[in-house]
Every structure is written in structure tokens, then in C-alpha cells.
Amino acid sequence: MANVHVINHPLVQHKLTIIRDKNTGTKAFRELVDEVATLMAYEITRDMELEDIQVETPLQTTTAKTLTGKKLGIVPILRAGLGMQDGILKLIPAAKVGHVGLYRDHDTLEPVEYFVKLPSDVEERLFIVVDPMLATGGSAIMAIDCLKKRGARNMKFMCLVAAPEGVKALQDAHPDVEIYVAGLDEKLDENGYIRPGLGDAGDRLFGTK
């Protein structure tokens, strides 16, 4: 699929297996999601631009590389996206953080927006929109819609697991947004859940039912 990057790093895949396991408790689940987010952030930032600068080492002046180009922003989709936020910030501590609050209506399976708060300089940033799961694609599409309406022009989407239906929906709605996923799963079931999936990420992160 165009613009879809499956992160097959052995550590990502190993940790994702434990995340999927129904016997993994809240504490371990939360820690593993955080760790996988850090590892995936390493991949999603691989194409960041560099420029040469002069730096003084203890021994001499030399040419070295430093980041340039667009500043970064992280936008977790509430609430489950919060579980990936700190893992990315460990790697990119200077990134600004916005939030988009959505919940899925369990009757219509459609997302409903209830909160949006973004940095003021949205036009200048590359945003990494994060949510552990890409199921129908509705929440990701609405979150990216929210950013674009407020002036954002550069975005990537990152999730742990995705259904093919959600990937296609997001690609159709936002073909300019690259998708980074740890596990591309089989399908959505009749209830709109990813199979085999990992259960309800929000409930497993926060210990709720």
C-alpha cells in the first residue's frame, strides 16, 4: 500500500506480541506501549532534514550535523493516544504537544469531537498524529481534518495496529499523510473491532472497563 510503513524491527514485533496478549496487565501494557512508541518514533523521524554546522570539540573545530527544517508536534487522539505521547517525547523532547479529543459512538461507529487544543504555530510544524489503533479510520480522518482546518499542512499518522479497511479509508481521505504501523492486521469484525487486534487500548492502558 502506498504511504504505509510497517515497522518490522524485531524489538517492535516482540513487544507488540506481549501487548496483544490478553494476560498482559495494565502496568506492563502501559510500559510496552510507551516503549514501542519510542522505537516507532525513531523510524518516523528517519527522513528529518539535517544541515552542517561548525562545532568546537575539546580538540578542534569540526563540521557536524544538526536538525533543520520543520519543527515537530505530537497530537495524541484522546484518550488512548496519550499512551504513546511520552514515548515519543523521550526521543523528541522539544516537540510541542496538541490534543484532539474524540470518542467513538458504539451505535454508529462514527467519531464524535469533544476537544481540540493545538500549538499556535500549526503551519510551521510537522505533526505526528498518534492513536494505538486504526480501525474504521474515522477517528484518524477526523483528527487530521481538525488539524488541516486549523492550518496544519504536514502530518504523519502512527499506530500500533491497523485494519486494512481503516488504512484504505485514511488513504482515500488524506492521501498526503503517511501511515506508520507496527502490525497490519487481518480485518474488522461486524462490531468494528480489529482482528486479531489487542482489545480496547484505552481500557487496557488505564485499567478501565
Swiss-Prot record:
Q: Which GO cellular component terms, listed alphabetically, does the Swiss-Prot or TrEMBL entry include?
A: cytoplasm
Query: How is the activity of this chain controlled?
Result: Allosterically activated by GTP.
Residues binding uracil are I194, G199, D200, A201
Give the EC number(s) listed in the UniProt record: 2.4.2.9
**UniProt xrefs under SUPFAM superfamilies:** PRTase-like (SSF53271)
Q: What class of enzyme is it?
A: transferase
Please list the GO biological process terms of this entry: UMP salvage; uracil salvage
Query: What reactions does this protein catalyze?
Result: UMP + diphosphate = 5-phospho-alpha-D-ribose 1-diphosphate + uracil
* Pathway in which the depicted protein is active: Pyrimidine metabolism; UMP biosynthesis via salvage pathway; UMP from uracil: step 1/1
UniProt keywords (A-Z) are: Allosteric enzyme, Glycosyltransferase, GTP-binding, Magnesium, Nucleotide-binding, Transferase
Superkingdom assignment: Bacteria
Q: How is the cofactor bound?
A: Binds 1 Mg(2+) ion per subunit. The magnesium is bound as Mg-PRPP.
Q: Which InterPro entries match?
A: PRibTrfase_dom, PRTase-like, Upp_B, UPRTase/APRTase, Ura_phspho_trans
Which residues of the sequence carry a binding annotation for 5-phospho-alpha-D-ribose 1-diphosphate?
A: R79, R104, D131, P132, M133, L134, A135, T136, G137, G138, S139, D200
State the CDD domains in the record: PRTases_typeI
GO MF annotations, alphabetized = GTP binding; magnesium ion binding; uracil phosphoribosyltransferase activity
Q: Which cofactor does it need?
A: Mg(2+)
* UniProt record similarity statement: Belongs to the UPRTase family.
**Alphabetical list of PANTHER family matching this protein:** ADENINE PHOSPHORIBOSYLTRANSFERASE, URACIL PHOSPHORIBOSYLTRANSFERASE, CHLOROPLASTIC
Its biological purpose:
Catalyzes the conversion of uracil and 5-phospho-alpha-D-ribose 1-diphosphate (PRPP) to UMP and diphosphate.
- What name does UniProt use for this protein? Uracil phosphoribosyltransferase
Gene encoding the protein: upp
